[in-house]
């Protein structure tokens, strides 16, 4: 009702696949065309993939949806060593849950502190201390060289410098990439 009072049509659950700014028209995935005066593009995003050799192997997990969590859960019985790449909120939450289940968990963070892009040093230090206290092995300033593959699945993570970490399960939590392809195709400029 509040949206209607502001003369705004909210259309949740519709996927826009193309935009024609000159015609003030957007085309939905099902072919429906929607005309607009002004449009707000709330694009959402997809998990960033690991840009390292082996980063696209089956069995490299991300956490974005319930289905992602279910896929991780399905592999937990046979996973003793879990490597989480990314020391943001997603990676730390996963580490907390998994170490609580008795798993050996290593968190690899490229920055020199956890949560570096979203929190100040004091909060980063607090999360690091609490996770270490619970048994999470945290490696800061970690650079991933490759995912070690065995039988088409991840078997470990190789760090720059040559150290290998065993991994029965790898979770990547390194942010999201906005889904802006239809806007770029319509002529919008992508900020870099």
Feature-to-residue mapping (PLM):
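A conserved short coil-to-beta-strand element within the FAD-binding core of flavoproteins
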Residues: 12-24, 140-153
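FAD-binding core/adjacent interface of flavoenzyme oxidoreductases
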Residues: 3-81, 158-164, 169-174, 178, ...
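Rossmann-like dinucleotide-binding cores of NAD(P)H-dependent redox enzymes
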Residues: 81, 90-146
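Glycine-rich Rossmann-fold phosphate-binding loop(s) that bind the pyrophosphate
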Residues: 64-65, 85-90
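Glycine-rich loop(s) and the adjacent beta-strand/alpha-helix scaffold that form part
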Residues: 185-192
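Active-site loop signature of alpha/beta-hydrolase-fold enzymes
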Residues: 48, 113, 146-147, 179
